[in-house]
């Protein structure tokens, strides 16, 4: 009991703070009073605190950091660098660069710009020369060889007329020239110039217009001497029977066929070599579109409907063309258009009657094809519509 009481007395008699600590507490309590009262703290109280920092007590409370402020440079949560002067480039595992770090940098000279794109090389810009692509187009030149050739659209000649057309449109173009669309006579030119056309006119030089095309095979492209305009036929894959209605020449009026506007088409068949050689009718019907005219005197029959000034020129033109072969050209194309025929028939009625008399001897062989009433109505003075309607009904029956 004595020992316990003696030990407890010793602990109670010992002060809780040392005199230095007590002095420090009093100094802090005084500063606190100034702060609570709102009065500025005297500077001597602050200086005393600064001096006390150098004491052993302060050194124990705030231990000296050997790294200094390096922790703020490395950032929070990072481990301190065990080797400060070494390059910090690693592979993410155990390997680390052994070189010395560059001054004011964490990496050496080799790894300093590793993050940047060092593979930038001066690429030589090769100037590629672009050649202009020219679309080839099908052209026909006005010479003795009318075979189609491919010519560039960028270098166009004035001596060649370019057509972008198919083979069917070529045949239609040859038929249109044979039909009188070239404008050889003055009446024909006046007719087509008075009507508005939707297709452009390719121009030709006068030297080319004087040349004529002699085609021994399937095509014949003809350009007359006084021709100032030609038709550029669209490249449509239509049948040959639709070419007679092209450019509004043979319009279908009330569903009337070609015999309404071309009643003289059947008459030209009598002048053909098929009739003179007395070939069977089945042969003519099987091959009606390949008609070769060798007798130029009988070809000139359809020129009697033109004016006297133009007929002399056409007669001279056909003397040079003694043999021509037309593909997809029916015999009705040997005759001029309905409007030209109507205008010229008033002036040359005597010549028309002579032609009827000359061809009357050869009508009987084709009566089984056109009907018996056709020959009677042919000599009558009915209108063209009546004649064609009778012939159409006869052939339909």
Swiss-Prot record:
Which intervals carry biased composition (Basic residues)? 111-120
**Region of interest (Disordered), residue spans:** 108-172, 197-217, 288-320, 340-397
Q: Where is this motif: Bipartite nuclear localization signal?
A: 78-96, 114-121
The cellular component terms of Gene Ontology attached to this UniProt record, alphabetical and capped at eight, are: nucleus
Where is composition skewed (Basic and acidic residues) in this entry? 288-298
Which keywords accompany this UniProt record?
Activator, Nucleus, Transcription, Transcription regulation
Q: Which GO terms describe its biological process?
A: DNA-templated transcription; leaf development; regulation of DNA-templated transcription; response to cold; response to gibberellin
Regarding tissue, the record states:
Strongly expressed in actively growing and developing tissues, such as roots, upper stems, and shoot tips containing the shoot apical meristem (SAM) and flower buds. Also expressed in mature flowers, but weakly expressed in mature stems and leaves.
Q: Where is the composition biased (Low complexity)?
A: 128-172
How are the domains described in the entry?
A: The QLQ domain and WRC domain may be involved in protein-protein interaction and DNA-binding, respectively.
Functional summary from the UniProt entry: Transcription activator that plays a role in the regulation of cell expansion in leaf and cotyledons tissues. Acts together with GIF1 for the development of appropriate leaf size and shape through the promotion and/or maintenance of cell proliferation activity in leaf primordia.
- Identification of the protein by name: Growth-regulating factor 5
């Amino acid at each position: 009991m004595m020992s316990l009481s003696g030990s407890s007395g010793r602990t109670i008699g010992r002060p809780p703070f040392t005199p230095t600590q007590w002095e420090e507490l009093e100094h802090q309590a005084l500063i606190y009073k100034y702060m609570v009262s709102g009065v500025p703290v005297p500077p001597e109280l602050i200086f005393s605190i600064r001096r006390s920092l150098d004491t052993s007590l302060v050194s124990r409370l705030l231990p000296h950091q050997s790294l200094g402020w390096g922790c703020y440079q490395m950032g929070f949560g990072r481990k301190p660098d065990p080797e400060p002067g070494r390059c910090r480039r690693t592979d993410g595992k155990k390997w680390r660069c052994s070189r010395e770090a560059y001054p004011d940098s964490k990496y050496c000279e080799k790894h300093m710009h590793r993050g940047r794109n060092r593979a930038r090389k001066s690429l030589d810009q090769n100037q590629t020369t672009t050649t202009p692509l020219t679309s080839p187009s099908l052209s026909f030149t006005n010479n003795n060889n009318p075979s189609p050739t491919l010519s560039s659209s960028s270098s166009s000649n004035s001596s060649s007329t370019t057509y972008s057309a198919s083979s069917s449109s070529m045949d239609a173009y040859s038929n249109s020239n044979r039909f009188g669309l070239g404008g050889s006579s003055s009446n024909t030119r006046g007719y087509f110039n008075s009507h508005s056309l939707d297709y452009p006119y390719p121009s030709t030089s006068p030297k080319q217009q004087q040349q004529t095309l002699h085609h021994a095979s399937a095509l014949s492209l003809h350009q007359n001497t006084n021709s100032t305009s030609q038709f550029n036929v669209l490249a449509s894959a239509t049948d040959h029977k639709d070419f007679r209605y092209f450019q509004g020449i043979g319009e279908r009026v009330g569903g009337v066929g070609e015999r309404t506007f071309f009643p003289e088409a059947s008459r030209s068949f009598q002048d053909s070599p098929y009739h003179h050689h007395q070939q069977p009718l089945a042969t003519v019907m099987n091959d009606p579109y390949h008609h070769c005219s060798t007798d130029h005197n009988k070809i000139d029959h359809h020129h009697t409907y033109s004016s006297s000034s133009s007929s002399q020129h056409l007669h001279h033109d056909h003397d040079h063309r003694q043999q021509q072969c037309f593909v997809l050209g029916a015999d009705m194309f040997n005759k001029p258009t309905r409007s030209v025929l109507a205008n010229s028939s008033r002036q040359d009625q005597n010549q028309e009657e002579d032609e009827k008399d000359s061809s009357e001897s050869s009508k009987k062989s084709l009566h089984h094809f056109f009907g018996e009433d056709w020959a009677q109505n042919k000599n009558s003075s009915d209108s063209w519509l009546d004649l064609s309607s009778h012939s159409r009904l006869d052939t339909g029956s």
